[in-house]
């Protein structure tokens, strides 16, 4: 015990003799430890992305390679018909989902209006591919019909208040949508961001939505495919 005490006394005396070097060393040590802790916290957060999904190790996002004017670009945006085509071609693909973000959508509920930027069209299979916690309603059939919607808790509270909004309706760009379910807000460590989902079957030619034949749906590249 006395030996340890002697070491401590000796170390303290040496520190007092070279105060400037002591301050520099302590500062550098503090910076090093702080940097290591911050780096570990950052890596832990980055590596936690999308780990909340039950099938996270089997989910893949398709990227597109585009050649325009001699330039090659890699983007996550893919053709509308790619999902159905890949499922027909490869038996290993159990399911796919297309998510098409909507830049701006005017929402009307009675005499109130909202300009929302966090909505997206999606296939009903989104809840088979990704895991979400349901507050009201259920996953089955929630987006299978045209003009149906699933809202996050925050958006549902914004539109309808702190009540169960399933069965309620709202108008969006001239169409009326029926709220089928409410899910919890997406966690911060999710690379997919949306406040609400609208059935991808809303509007247009319903038979063509899942077709791989029409040339039009190969030329449209406006969605993410998983």
Residue ranges with predicted function:
Residues 64-76, 98-125, 135-148, 187-189, ...:
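Short acidic/polar micro-motifs at solvent-exposed secondary-structure junctions
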Residues 1-5:
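Feature of multi-pass inner-membrane transport and sensor proteins
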Residues 18-45:
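Short, strongly hydrophobic transmembrane alpha-helices
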Residues 7-16:
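A short amphipathic helical element positioned immediately N-terminal to and/or at the very start
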Residues 15-18, 25, 46, 62, ...:
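Generic structural signal for small/hydrophobic residues in well-ordered secondary structure
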């Amino acid at each position: 015990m006395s030996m340890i005490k002697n070491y401590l006394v000796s170390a303290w005396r040496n520190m007092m003799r070279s105060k400037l070097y002591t301050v520099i060393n302590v500062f550098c040590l503090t910076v090093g430890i702080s940097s290591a802790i911050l780096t570990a916290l950052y890596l832990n957060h980055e590596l936690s992305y999308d780990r909340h999904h039950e099938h996270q190790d089997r989910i893949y996002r398709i990227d597109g390679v585009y050649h325009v004017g001699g330039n090659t670009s890699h983007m996550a945006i893919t053709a509308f018909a790619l999902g159905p085509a890949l499922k027909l071609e490869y038996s290993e693909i159990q399911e796919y989902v297309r998510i098409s973000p909507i830049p701006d959508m005017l929402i009307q509920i009675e005499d109130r209006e909202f300009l929302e930027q966090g909505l997206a069209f999606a296939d009903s299979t989104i809840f088979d591919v990704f895991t979400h916690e349901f507050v009201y309603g259920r996953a089955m059939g929630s987006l299978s019909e045209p003009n149906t919607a699933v809202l996050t808790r925050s958006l549902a509270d914004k539109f309808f208040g702190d009540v169960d909004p399933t069965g309620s309706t709202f108008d969006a760009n001239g169409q009326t949508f029926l709220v089928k379910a409410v899910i919890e807000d997406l966690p911060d460590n999710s690379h997919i961001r949306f406040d609400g989902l609208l059935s991808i079957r809303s509007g247009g030619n319903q038979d063509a939505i899942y077709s791989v034949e029409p040339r039009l749906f190969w030329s449209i590249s406006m969605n993410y495919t998983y």
